[in-house]
Amino acid sequence: MNNAFLGYYIGVEVDTLWFHATRVAEERREGRALVLLAETNDPLGHRMEIRLEPKAPGVITTSARVVPGSGPLASFARVAGAGFEAAPGERYLGFGERSNAADQTGREVFSWAEEGPFSSGAADDLLRPLLPEFTFPTGPAATNLPIPWTVTTRGFGVLIDQPHRSTFHLASDRNDAWRLEAEAGHLDFTVFAGPTPAKALRRYSEYAGRQPKPAPWFFGPWFQPTLEGRPFELADRFRKEDVPVSVVQTYTHYLPCGDHRGREQQERERIRGYHSRGYRITTYFNPHVCTDYGEAYGEAAARGFFIRNMLGRPYVLSNPFTADERVSEIDFTNPEAARFWQRLLDDAIDAGYDGWMEDFGEYTPTDSVAADGSGGLELHNRYPVLYHCASYEHTRKRMGRDAAIFVRSGFHGIQRCARIVWGGDPTEDWSCADGLCAAVHQTLSTGLSGIAYWGSDIGGFHALVNPRTDDELNARWLEFGAFSGIMRTQANGLSLLSSRADRSQVWHPAVMPIWRRYTKLRTRLAPYIQAASRTYQRRGLPITRHLALVFPRDARAVAQQEEFMFGPDLLVAPVIEKGARERSLYLPRGRWVDVWRSLAYRERSGAFRLGRATLLRGRREVT
């Protein structure tokens, strides 16, 4: 049915039949907007109203609506779409945070905020021959942070500018056209001119908003202690052994269940202890409230502050990993509910925390109802933006720039409210489904979507059906993490087959020297990273840059998916294969210096010394 979707059609789907505009019957001006009334190939005579309006230099919005004729088309139109011509060799980048690839050419990419994808781990050898792209829960395109946006290598970008579930068909069913579709009876999209991918991205990031200016200490190394009874032991050890670390991550769950209650004095003493040692410290929140968090749940339920079910009652969700934890979700479309939730944040702010993990946001049920009348299908993708922006507006007033709040969920518009994005809960493996390789794709795709301050769970989080992170994987992930927007390690996680004791940690003997080396290097790079951050604030160019943003006319550079520029001058090619002791990479045009052969590291002092540099010629592959 989609063969009629050529590279210049716009139309709607009714009961699996597509109808598209055929010719312009009328046109008129409404202010700056051009409004077209187009005839369609629908035999019942329905027409389409198409509105084009400039929003900024090089930015044009397009809205398409059905004008009813004599039949049921307007009532039953369920999908609207538009087609574009595909040029030979054109590539499609962006789409928010994506694990499976940075370049989605030839694929279908949907936008729906959800958990995943999770790697099949130890079951991979069994599943891969049968299901080549098998990943939990809904396949390789699953993501916590979809953005229905693409920047193409032809030098322009397109945003599906509505919250409904949408899909890009990227030359996946015909090589001369690509199209976009929204699961709604109308279509809103915005086009951003180039002429280069970097220029189109700049326009998009001006339109969507850029991440708030970070505090300098965000860019230092982060670590998570695991010694609950001895909270300062690792922090003191790192200071003693000359390992520079800026942030300590702790996870008292202020929400959903109010785990801080009865521990307030202990919390304050721990915070003071880390602060006195020169560390910043974070904790944990999510947008849910446990049904047994008496005073908080009772007030919120009585005042209508939760997302409701079809009967008008608080929608109660169950945690799939904790059977006895039942929660309801704050309704951020209600300003009073947002203010109630902000008061809960004050418990951690008043205790002295410097930030927190702001978890979840992807669970709004499709059959729920919000205070503003939105149904779950429309609210689902909007919810994480409303959630994180409620937090940002409050912490901006209470804490200024010194609020290290890191989020995993989002949608278009999240950029202006997400101080830090982390890549969700990756699998503790090497895979491009959800492991280390996937993290490289994530940093590139988020950067191409207007996000600069991003970091992964170094070492991974999930080990559902696979072994825990070993020393080799931990070391390689550390190397990659040192060249991410945020360098943040993970020490815990979720495993069904083994315990935390089986997991490699950065302070273990085999990894500690590597941890020290890369924290020292990261700290030495602080002025360079902060300069790259200022470039992002001015121009929207991310810290980790897909080569298409820097070398748009070099076809071989544009094709790379597992190497990137870190800031303006460093080309990074992480080792992402188990057992590898070398890897090849493509050097784009220009002259290059091999840092590792030109920079000497002294283990005893932790100092780096510049040695003799040999220039390498670009436009070729090296090992």
Feature-to-residue mapping (PLM):
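Short, solvent-exposed turn/loop segments enriched in Gly/Ser/Thr/Pro and often Arg
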Residues: Q162, F223, Q249-Y254, F285-D292, ...
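Catalytic core of carbohydrate-active enzymes
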Residues: N3-F5, V12-E13, Y392-A404, G410-G423, ...
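Active-site-proximal helices and loops of the catalytic beta/alpha 8
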Residues: P72, A86, T252, R263-T322, ...
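Catalytic and substrate-binding clefts that recognize carbohydrates or anionic sugar/phosphate headgroups
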Residues: M1-P216, W222-L227, A235-K240, F411, ...
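Extracellular glycoside hydrolase catalytic/binding regions
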Residues: I420-V440
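Beta-sheet entry/capping signal
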Residues: G58-S63, P148-W149, G155-G157, D188, ...
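Aromatic-lined carbohydrate-binding/catalytic grooves of carbohydrate-active enzymes
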Residues: K213-S374, Q415
